[in-house]
Curated annotation (Swiss-Prot):
It is an enzyme of class 3 (hydrolase). InterPro entries: CoAse (IPR045121), NUDIX_hydrolase-like_dom_sf (IPR015797), NUDIX_hydrolase_dom (IPR000086), NUDIX_hydrolase_NudL_CS (IPR000059), Nudix_NudL (IPR023735). It comes from Escherichia coli (strain SMS-3-5 / SECEC). It holds the Pfam family NUDIX. Belongs to the Nudix hydrolase family. PCD1 subfamily. PROSITE patterns: NUDIX (PS51462), NUDIX_COA (PS01293). Signal peptide: none annotated. Probably mediates the hydrolysis of some nucleoside diphosphate derivatives. Mg(2+) binds at E83, E87. The keyword Transcription regulation does not apply. HAMAP family: Nudix_NudL. GO terms for biological process: nucleoside diphosphate metabolic process. This is Uncharacterized Nudix hydrolase NudL.
Amino acid sequence: MEYRSLTLDDFLSRFQLLRPQINRETLNHRQAAVLIPIVRRPQPGLLLTQRSIHLRKHAGQVAFPGGAVDDTDASVIAAALREAEEEVAIPPSTVEVIGVLPPVDSVTGYQVTPVVGIIPPDLPYRASEDEVSAVFEMPLAQALHLGRYHPLDIYRRGDSHRVWLSWYEQYFVWGMTAGIIRELALQIGVKP
């Protein structure tokens, strides 16, 4: 796939043709979800946030909108939509959910389900001052180019964990967020 010319139609066709395998073993039992917001344009964008530097966990990191599943959430999809509305003011009714990726174990003990959704291009994003310091859009074709991600092996508590890292403009994209973007690229058939 030529990543420089990815259209929204190409992305949707590839995503729907290659359904993800969800039967992954996970070590964590606490549930969380993130929304992967794809901005509806002929050349689609990927909406990302930078977390507030005042947060206890993952301060200042680039992330998708998301968080823990609450008792009031009907599903992981509902949790992702609720969190996206709380963090960046994306109304749930404007999100066209097209599917989910396999859950990912976070270092903080959550099983995180990435929910892929298409959002309108003209939404007035409003970052939650408590949680988000910036909202930015990255061209989806650039985000899904696997050559931009570099492996880094981190040793923690006697175990080795591979994380991926990249950057876009002044933003450093790494860890679970970079891993989810890579998983999305592999899901639509991008070759390493």
